[in-house]
Amino acid sequence: MEEIQRYLQPDRSQQHNFLYPLIFQEYIYALAHDHGLNRNRSILLENPGYNNKLSFLIVKRLITRMYQQNHFLISTNDSNKNSFLGCNKSLYSQMISEGFAFIVEIPFSLRLISSLSSFEGKKIFKSHNLRSIHSTFPFLEDNFSHLNYVLDILIPYPVHLEILVQTLRYWVKDASSLHLLRFFLHEYWNLNSLITSKKPGYSFSKKNQRFFFFLYNSYVYECESTFVFLRNQSSHLRSTSFGALLERIYFYGKIERLVEVFAKDFQVTLWLFKDPFMHYVRYQGKSILASKGTFLLMNKWKFYLVNFWQCHFSLCFHTGRIHINQLSNHSRDFMGYLSSVRLNPSMVRSQMLENSFLINNAIKKFDTLVPIIPLIGSLAKANFCTVLGHPISKPVWSDLSDSDIIDRFGRICRNLFHYYSGSSKKKTLYRIKYILRLSCARTLARKHKSTVRTFLKRSGSELLEEFLTSEEQVLSLTFPRASSSLWGVYRSRIWYLDIFCINDLANYQ
């Protein structure tokens, strides 16, 4: 009972966070742009883009304008004539938004510090390795092979900007800061400028990316925190009890009523959502809810989530955004891998005295494969090959030196091998390696105005050494006389804990 009250009761230490005065401090903008600081020490998200136009002279000019301005107003009819933003509207807006994003992270960081301080005398779990994208796959290997069904969910983004403000007002109690937030959201009122939803997994525009990442993460955190609470307590509620909790505005006002509800000993308890083998994973605007239960249970969870988003966030969320799939018969695109749970048949011979038996066993195994068609499509988009996978030269890099060209091709190849080292089958990777290697040779041959055959004869094996992956280098040093049995080592899956993002193939254009 005390645990329920602690969850429902808002954190009183976060009730009075006056963050608005910090927007007038110069050091806030220095911290936001990581001046003189280690970039890895960012609280929630490392600033992905750095604007070289920032200088303390511009910051001083911006702060002076904010001091002289009595209020933030923006004319929707004639925004170009706004006296506050002036001709540097884009630059000033980006600076303020980045500074504001850094400021509103403070309540979340304080909550994180307070939660860590509660572990006094206990061993605090080191979560640095959990930042890696690959840290999710060992979890899937251990748990998903025993499950039956999965819900593939496309998380809806808020269609109204006021939803984002209402989400943050439970953390930031400073009214001035919330008004400033509304100012920027109405400045970028067009959602197409915030979120690009050309693909099922949408992403944010590059402009003010940190600011919008923070807003989106706070919105998703609000979804998941309420959802997890309802999930943990669902077995103690009647079928109509959880519906009253969907309105977060009155969430804290129902404490007394909830205490009475939980204090009663129900004769009939609803166990529709009671499932100890439920696992939830979120990634790239999507989420997965896997269970060992039946199709009926997953269908009830599906309609529960649809009603949750519609009632809680006033979203027109239809059932087509949630798909129920059987793990053994479906492959999904998960973090660049094609993952599935397949049956691995095996034959066991049992000998009992004079009789022998053959036993067929089918073991479920979590399988991860490289999606060859999308990967070749990415290479074709970056002008390394055609859409059919035929290598072509890279004319844009022809003006570079030979060492730079080889280094760039080799770096892309090593990055791809490094990220897809967890693949169950490496044959696809060697095809990608062949495309990049031949594309590099054709680029060098184009530069020196010769044929590929002539260039390869002249370069020898040096070009091959540049395309050795880190795994191959380690194995070649450990086993200088590799035998055919080493092929099993190449086929083994390797997960790394130092991968924090997926490298863009066109990053070096």
UniProtKB/Swiss-Prot annotation:
GO cellular component, as recorded: chloroplast
A molecular-function term among this protein's GO annotations: RNA binding
Coarse class of the protein's main subcellular location: plastid
Cell compartments where the protein resides: Plastid, Chloroplast
GO BP, one annotated term: tRNA processing
Superkingdom of origin organism: Eukaryota
Transmembrane segments: none
Keywords of the record: Chloroplast, mRNA processing, Plastid, RNA-binding, tRNA processing
Ranges in a coiled coil: none
Role played: Usually encoded in the trnK tRNA gene intron. Probably assists in splicing its own and other chloroplast group II introns.
HAMAP family: MatK
Family: Belongs to the intron maturase 2 family. MatK subfamily.
Protein's name in the database: Maturase K
Protein's organism: Nicotiana plumbaginifolia
